[in-house]
Each structure stands twice: as structure tokens, then as C-alpha cells.
Amino acid sequence: MLNSRELLRLHDENTRRWHTITPRFDGEPTAFEAAVEQQHFANFQLWHEEDKARVPGAHDYEIAAVKRNIDKYNQRRNDLMELCDVFALAELGKSNLPRAEAPLHSESLGLMIDRLSILSLKIYHTQYEIDRTSAPAGHADRNRERLATLNDQRNDLAIALDALWAESLAGRRRFKIYRQLKMYNEPSLNPQIYHAPKRD
């Protein structure tokens, strides 16, 4: 299992690398660290696809294609977030943990990892805006304030993640998988699809 320092390094190094090189993954992750990495890549893809949706003057057909990609990447993000929890709970299970009587944490490890992944992307792109020489006056200063807030929030969350894992290992706290159960990618759960007239 990764501690928060290793996790943040994995997020940040990959965020920088993937802006230059598109990664290739060999199938579905079979271990915790691989799940963390692929989950971060799903957020990376989602971030940049959402940017495309906000481009002024984009055609309707382009927005429709982007929306479908956003749904796909978001589903992937959530599936991998849950897989992070599966691997973490399997590791705890080797020691007959978590204990059923331990207080339940309101957020799972995977949900916290997802939030840290998004913060890594926010920090990278905020730093980019600080460094952008074509930006108007005051832009860099405003983004320096944002960056300080983002780093502070990420530090707090990283400490909380380490504490949750340590307390789970000690049997003093537990977490469980909170399934997202997204409905929009399931045709049988979308009335706009199952009530739509059939086309010839």
C-alpha cells in the first residue's frame, strides 16, 4: 500500500508526464498501485475532455461527442475508485480487518484518493496559469492565492488519508466501498432511452 507521500508523487509525476506522453496500460489493474495510477489517468482524461466542452463556438455534434466521452471517462473513474477500495480492503482482510465494531468512516479510501487525484490536476493547471506569460495583469497573483489554498487542502486530505489507513490497520476505524451506482450509462435505467421511439 502507498502512503500519502508516495501517492502524491505518483499523481504529480504522472500528471506532468501525461501532458507529453500518452500512457499505455496492459489491461485492468491487478494491484492497488496500478488501480491508483489508472484511476488518476481517468481523471486526467475527464479533466481535458471537460475543457473541450467549454470551447466557445463548438458545434452541437462536437459537444455531443464530448458529452459521451465525459460519461465514459467518469464511469471509468468511478469503477477504478471502487477498485482501489477493493484492493485496500483485501489487504486489511489478511489481518481479519476491518473490525465490525470499529467506528465507520464516512468516506472510503478510494474516495479520498479520487479527491487527491483531482487536486493534483488542479495544482498542475494552476501553476501553469501562474507561469503563463500571455495572461493579463494580476492573473498570476490571483492564481498564486488559489495555489496556496489548493496545497493547504491537499496537505490536510493527505494527513487524513494516512490517519484513516493507520487507524484501520490498528482496528480502531473501518471504511467500506460506497458504490456510485451511476445510472446514465445504463440504457435500462434511462427513461430518455427506453421511452424513445424506435428508429427504422
Which role fits each region the language model picked out?
Residues M1-D200:
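Anionic, Ser/Thr-rich low-complexity intrinsically disordered regions
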